[in-house]
Amino acid sequence: MKLAYWMYAGPAHIGTLRVASSFKNVHSIMHAPLGDDYFNVMRSMLERERDFTPVTTSVVDRQVLARGSDEKVIRNIVRKDGEEQPDLIVVTPTCTSSILQEDLHHFVRQAQLASRCDVVLADVNHYRVNELQAADRTLQQIVEFYITKARKSGELDGLPQKTERPSCNILGISSLGFHNAHDLRELKALLRDLDIDLNLVIPQGASVHDLKHLGRAWFNVVPYRELGPMTARYLQQEFGMPYIEITPMGVVETARFIRQIQQILNEQGIPVDYEAYIQEQTLHISQAAWFSRSIDCQNLTGKKAVVFGDSTHAAAITKILAREMGIHVVWAGSYCTYDGEWFQAEVGEYCDQILMTEDHTRVADAIAQAEPAAIFGTQMERHVGKRLRIPCGVISAPIHVQDFPIGYRPFLGYEGANQIVDLIYNSFTLGMEDHLLEIFGGHDTKEVIHKSLSADSDLIWTREAQAELDKVPGFVRGKVKRNTEKFARERGLTEISVEVMYAAKEAFGA
């Protein structure tokens, strides 16, 4: 365990609460001390929804520490059952309250006897998994609970009857997901074009009573690696349902996704051929393929970029940059360190290096050393980019409220490909833009911090050298500063004068 003031993925209970609060009429009770109860505030601030967050905190206070939690937890469960009348109550401790080592299973069993709704304890090890892994496990646990319940009651006997027309489930659309609502809308449109019905979307907006119908679909779609694969594997094991793990992000991967659907339907006796649809969308409907061959996009060829985010988005954006737009990806990385083997296999051929870490300082230093023309990452990489004066496009959670847009901004499908191309192109500094702003004045005339993220307090710039540095065009000033400081350190200098600047320029050949 280590102290951190920044985490890419939150603690396990956040993942459990994200999944539970995505379902309709499901309430969560968090057994936690004050301080762990920030999920309500975070979700209310970020998610653009009208409803209150259905989470109650059963506070671990001095009385609980003295007398135990059983009476309080059971009372809160029974009270919420009466007040809210939910279909399900999910009980979860946090990593802090788990230290008490209380028998929450016993509390849940006792509460179930006095409650009309179902009560489930989240089956998550709060010390071993993070938010994403816990969300994946919680979704699978809830699905398994209701399918098992349906089997016991006789509502589900053997393999369920398939829908008359080809249909699918979409697994993994959740609260606080990165552009999830927009991606769902785009996926629905894509499936409608392919004449495929939608059976269920889980967990977002789903009723737990409908989960017994999951097996009626012909196949499952898992758009994100972070949430849904465990449920897809369980449904495959339980009902023999095939599933698609290809993320339809970018023109090439969207075509692969559609061909995978075609293969699954052909294997189930439906002779479909989607090649004409793929060609029409790629060549005439989507603007992404055309734009990638335009003069504007060719200006980006060979430019350097770095990518960091969750496995799904970082891998997809890396492939789009390298394969579809000809941009040189210096390194790509993910904070999903448990998924390193898959990430390496996916993007190893599209970038020079791979960085798997949860340490934001390592990411920041890697960005400073690479000196890319653009960054594609999370909100933390955007902060780093501002300090280094490098533009950043946000492509993955964790994110600020401005990345929960009101307007339609999908990342999946053909419209998503258009949005991504816009994001990538607009993230690069175009030509002499910064330099012209400095020459003619304007909104960007403020003084900018060029300080490297590495410690450089040992070097002093003379007033003349600083004035000379300020004459350098803004889009290369940071690089000139770093090269000069590197030159000075290698020679043991503590002060940078104009002479040192020119010597460094000569040494670096620029």
Curated annotation (Swiss-Prot):
[4Fe-4S] cluster binds at D36. Protochlorophyllide reductase is composed of three subunits; ChlL, ChlN and ChlB. Forms a heterotetramer of two ChlB and two ChlN subunits. The keyword Nucleotide-binding applies. Keywords: 4Fe-4S, ATP-binding, Chlorophyll biosynthesis, Iron, Iron-sulfur, Metal-binding, Nucleotide-binding, Oxidoreductase, Photosynthesis. This is Light-independent protochlorophyllide reductase subunit B. It is an enzyme of class 1 (oxidoreductase). Binds 1 [4Fe-4S] cluster per heterodimer. The cluster is bound at the heterodimer interface by residues from both subunits. It comes from the Bacteria. Substrate binds at G431, M432. GO terms for molecular function: 4 iron, 4 sulfur cluster binding; ATP binding; metal ion binding; oxidoreductase activity, acting on iron-sulfur proteins as donors; oxidoreductase activity, acting on the CH-CH group of donors, iron-sulfur protein as acceptor. It catalyses: chlorophyllide a + oxidized 2[4Fe-4S]-[ferredoxin] + 2 ADP + 2 phosphate = protochlorophyllide a + reduced 2[4Fe-4S]-[ferredoxin] + 2 ATP + 2 H2O. The active site is at D296. Its cofactor is [4Fe-4S] cluster. Pathway: Porphyrin-containing compound metabolism; chlorophyll biosynthesis (light-independent). The keyword Nucleotide-binding applies.
